[in-house]
Amino acid sequence: MRLVTTTADLKAYYTDKSIAAPLNGMDKTGFKHIDLSISGVMYKDSPWIQNGDKWKFEVEDCLKIAEEKGFDFCQAHSPYINSFENDEKTEALTVAIRNSIEACKMLSIPHTVVHPIALYGATPNEFLNKNIEYYRQFTDDTEKNNVDILMENSSSKWNPQCYIRTGKELREFVEKSDMPHMHICWDTGHGNVQGQNQIDDIVAMGSELKALHIHDNYGNEDSHTMPLIGTTNFDNVVKGLLKIGYGGDFTFEACATLRRVNAWPNYRRDVKDSDLLSNPPLYIVQKQQALMYEVGKWMLESYNIKVE
């Protein structure tokens, strides 16, 4: 099983908004298999939310850096919004997701993760139908580019009107969507906040589970720390993966283990402009990432899973 981490880990250390920028620091983390974060492209005048091909320059830069540093791309994370309440944002998201699917093809990435979108005031069934209607519009894109989109579990803690929170609900969504290229990404941190027995969730997803977001927390907030810093039972996670014969990657999304001052949802207190210790420097974060690689290797090898 490959150990993977996301470029979102280092994004804050680069003023360049290009999705390629964080790759410049990934070679000092110990990871060679990369989850490419395309989730932060929903900003004003972003090439990703406009018609045209300017966003492809960023993808070409990704290819160049990956070749120079010996990386390969295993999965991606598409942009997202929290709710359908703003039509302009929803339209921009549609363009950005469509471009992210094509970007995956250019980078030989087999799948990209998407989020469920809340429909405020709706029943669970109305929410489900609205999300299916929205994501079905990408059917042709996924087929043309041979790229899967993977729905990720949320939590009622921060989005109480988002009704995709468990393995059973994810499986129901995928089956009801009836899209050949729609499958599942399970987020262990979200599952821990939701209070799930993650063996049961993983078994419920079964063969539809194609990717993971591995991170930890104390069960109260979506803190995105590395494993063993919170209360997630990772024995249950790994046992569940073995039980279903999971064949995907072990992908970390622990981008706030060493927290920056503005890292949601746990913000550093009483920060002043003159403070020198508010944000960890890049080189220390890279060392933390290297430690996380060793933790992941130990976790998998403890269950006789070979690390690639």
Give the positions of each predicted feature:
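Acidic (Asp/Glu)-rich catalytic clusters
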Residues: 23-30, 52-75, 98-108, 136-144, ...
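N-terminal small/glycine-rich loop or linker at the start of catalytic domains
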Residues: 1-8, 73-84
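Glycine-rich, proline-tolerant flexible connector loops at the mouths of alpha/beta enzymes
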Residues: 35-63, 122-123, 222
